[in-house]
């Protein structure tokens, strides 16, 4: 970020949060629009819920050997990214609250460094989320259209290498973000990466579902076991499509905010949109909360494992859940 962008970004957070502490609807002096008051407790609550949910997802994948497949390894990577963005948003909210209430007094330069770290964590999480979604999409593509060769193409070692590569790349992006935080080109690269990755994912899914239509008759002609595997693969593709849709809806306002801040910071309508920055952070955290619910809604194996972890850890004798056919 350049200095003016960075200071406006930080001041917007501070002003919005300060308004939340004094009342629900406080007009920002630098904006003609009223800020939507969001209590600090909302950020903390969503952060805790997201953290617990995604820990549950990771625990379920580790616990259940039936979930030890490349797709669920990539889902685990996505859950880590969701945890990271929720934790960074929650910690940033706590820091702003402490600064506004004079419980924490530190130099402005150090505040900027802290803000850079939080922004870097958000940068890492969004890149990791996009890369994990792309990896899941490619996995589903291979599962559907190269079913017989799937286990030779997507091995556990190869999926582990992909995940390691994703997080190495994301960590590198985070380091670059901190080192060149004064440059608007960093933000421009992040925005470009988001829309390019989104275009790539949407194109892949359109291609996937168009090809899937031609496979419907083939699936009907397959033996029962093969047909069931193909339908399961298609269900997995639908699940990832839901994840992509939620990701787009929840993250798009944030990136539109960044785009407007670079392109028209003085425009009246742009200022109105940017005055609701905290709402866009809430949407990002909602994405982290909703992803585990989608896993549970779409996967019977996940639901069963969630029940075992939640209910049967301390009450193994009392809790017993019949298996569904």
Curated annotation (Swiss-Prot):
Lipid attachment of type S-palmitoyl cysteine occurs at which residues? Answer: 311-312
Parts of the chain on the Cytoplasmic side: 62-73, 139-155, 212-239, 298-325
Q: Which GO terms describe its cellular component?
A: cytoplasm; plasma membrane
Keywords assigned: Cell membrane, G-protein coupled receptor, Glycoprotein, Lipoprotein, Membrane, Palmitate, Receptor, Transducer, Transmembrane, Transmembrane helix
Q: Which residues lie on this side of the membrane: Extracellular?
A: 1-37, 98-114, 180-186, 266-273
* Molecular function GO terms recorded: melanocortin receptor activity
Q: Where in the cell is it found?
A: Cell membrane
Membrane topology reported for the UniProt record: Multi-pass membrane protein
- Bilayer-crossing residues are 38-61, 74-97, 115-138, 156-179, 187-211, 240-265, 274-297
- The residues that carry sugar chains are 2, 15, 20, 28
Tell me if Glycoprotein is a UniProt keyword of this record.
yes
Please cite one Gene Ontology biological process associated with this protein: regulation of metabolic process
As for family, the record states: Belongs to the G-protein coupled receptor 1 family.
Would you tell me the protein name for this molecule? Melanocortin receptor 5
Tell me what organism the protein belongs to.
Pan troglodytes
Source taxonomy: Eukaryota, Metazoa, Chordata, Craniata, Vertebrata
Gene name in the database record:
MC5R
């Amino acid at each position: 970020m350049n200095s003016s962008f960075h200071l406006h970004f930080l001041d917007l957070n501070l002003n919005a949060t300060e308004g939340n502490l004094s009342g629900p609807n406080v007009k920002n002096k630098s904006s003609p629009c009223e800020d939507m008051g969001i209590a600090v407790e909302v950020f903390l609550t969503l952060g805790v819920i997201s953290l617990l949910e995604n820990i549950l997802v990771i625990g379920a994948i580790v616990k259940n050997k039936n979930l030890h497949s490349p797709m669920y390894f990539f889902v685990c990577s996505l859950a880590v990214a969701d945890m990271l963005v929720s934790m960074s948003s929650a910690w940033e909210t706590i820091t702003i609250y402490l600064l506004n209430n004079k419980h924490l007094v530190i130099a402005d330069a150090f505040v900027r460094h802290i803000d850079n770290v939080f922004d870097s964590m958000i940068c890492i999480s969004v890149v990791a989320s996009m890369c994990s979604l792309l990896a899941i999409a490619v996995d589903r593509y291979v599962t559907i259209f190269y079913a017989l060769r799937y286990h030779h193409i997507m091995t556990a070692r190869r999926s582990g290498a992909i995940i390691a590569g994703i997080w190495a790349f994301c960590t590198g992006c985070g380091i670059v973000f901190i080192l060149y935080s004064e440059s608007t080109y960093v933000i421009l690269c992040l925005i470009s990466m988001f829309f390019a990755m989104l275009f790539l994912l949407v194109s892949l899914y359109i291609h996937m579902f168009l090809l899937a239509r031609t496979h419907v008759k083939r699936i009907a002609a397959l033996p029962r076991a093969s047909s069931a595997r193909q339908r399961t693969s298609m269900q997995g593709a639908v699940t990832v499509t839901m994840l992509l849709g939620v990701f787009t809806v929840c993250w798009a306002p944030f990136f539109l905010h960044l785009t407007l801040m670079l392109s028209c910071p003085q425009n009246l309508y742009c200022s109105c949109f940017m005055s609701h920055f905290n709402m866009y952070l809430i949407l990002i955290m909602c994405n982290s909360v909703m992803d585990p619910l989608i896993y549970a809604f779409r996967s019977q194996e996940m639901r069963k494992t969630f029940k075992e972890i939640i209910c049967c850890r301390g009450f193994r004798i009392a809790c017993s859940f019949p298996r569904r056919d």
